[in-house]
């Protein structure tokens, strides 16, 4: 007999989460004009406003405009441009991430909101190849730069390819942004910045955010079999395996872990781990979360408990990790308070007891 819906626990880890450059839960990326930040990092705008951050008043959109808005920007008030999430500037001409393709070097540049307190670095080295903050040329934004010579042989070396037919030279590098210093989360980004030397075109920036480039995530049962559905109260092993970490790093451990589910436009979520330790709420609800390291991998072991009662709904996980130079160590967490025994009724034992000797 197939299990009833109340006993079926579906897993859909990470696959449907949209990875983008705007995530309203990151510092410096608020929803404007009364908009609400949703569980997936997108803004739900109030009536009359639109745009990725609800920053555009629909009543001000102009059919006729005295300026040209680039990169799919929208003209409003007749002479101003509302930009998409990847561009900025008076006419949306400036990308947040770009490079100056100089004769002998590639100067990588990035703009971030003034509230940004994270780090931007080349994937080869989180510490040796950081972009440093400089005086910003655009008010209201921080500006970061790193100038890398074409012939660099150090940790910040560029990837160089030469077209055998045309002789064109191509340089590229992967640039990572993390919004919390020393940590990596679901909505931190990775972009490829490149310079192509033939007609000296503007640098090309491609969003290649795919967290499987850094870590692979697997869900399995206690027998290490990969799973997509599991019985309620069975055990889930959620493992983060390092794949291509920034230079100098080998291990991964879990800092924060959140589980959530969406049903009928309602979101239920629970924070399972905070700063490496099981939360009191998770303990009270019986999730029994264990945070471990297995070699160089980080692993959370938890009990499968649905977030909606009597409903077959997939669950998703959001996470924040820390990379380690070798095998990670999990800090010692305080023990949760013992639960008081009920005294108002006679105990009714379920099943055969276990004798501890």
UniProtKB/Swiss-Prot annotation:
GO cellular component, one term: cell surface
Major site of localization recorded for this protein: secreted
Xref: Gene3D superfamilies: Laminin (2.10.25.10)
Lineage: superkingdom: Eukaryota
Tissue: Prismatic layer of shell (at protein level). Expressed primarily in the mantle with highest level in the mantle edge and lower level in the mantle pallium.
Compartments where located: Secreted
Descriptive protein name: EGF-like domain-containing protein 2
Origin species: Pinctada maxima (Silver-lipped pearl oyster)
